[in-house]
């Protein structure tokens, strides 16, 4: 995939469920539609929670790296 232009980076390293998703929700609401939030996490629950959050809240998970921590997720606000 080509380089993704990130609007904001959210570091949730060391935080455990439900904190990472709560911070994603808080931060993404301050972005405009189409802007990109890069989430960096080490909680294994995020591999399930971030994709579910995107689907439920109608955001787009553009890319993820979940082979080993730290996990990275590129989320576009909106569809």
From Swiss-Prot:
SUPFAM superfamilies per the record? SirA-like (SSF64307)
- What positions constitute the catalytic site? 17 (cysteine persulfide intermediate)
Q: Which Pfam families match?
A: TusA (PF01206)
Record-level GO BP terms: tRNA wobble position uridine thiolation
Superkingdom, natural source: Bacteria
Q: Give GO MF terms, alphabetically.
A: sulfur carrier activity
Subcellular location(s) of the protein: Cytoplasm
List the GO terms this entry assigns under cellular component, sorted alphabetically.
Answer: cytoplasm
Q: Does the keyword Transferase apply?
A: no
Reply yes or no: does the keyword Thylakoid apply.
no
Q: Which UniProt keywords apply?
A: Cytoplasm
What the entry lists under InterPro entries is as follows:
Sulphur_carrier_TusA, TusA-like, TusA-like_sf
Role of this protein: Sulfur carrier protein which probably makes part of a sulfur-relay system.
Protein family according to the UniProt entry: Belongs to the sulfur carrier protein TusA family.
This protein's name: Sulfur carrier protein TusA
Protein's organism: Haemophilus influenzae (strain PittGG)
Q: Which gene encodes it?
A: tusA
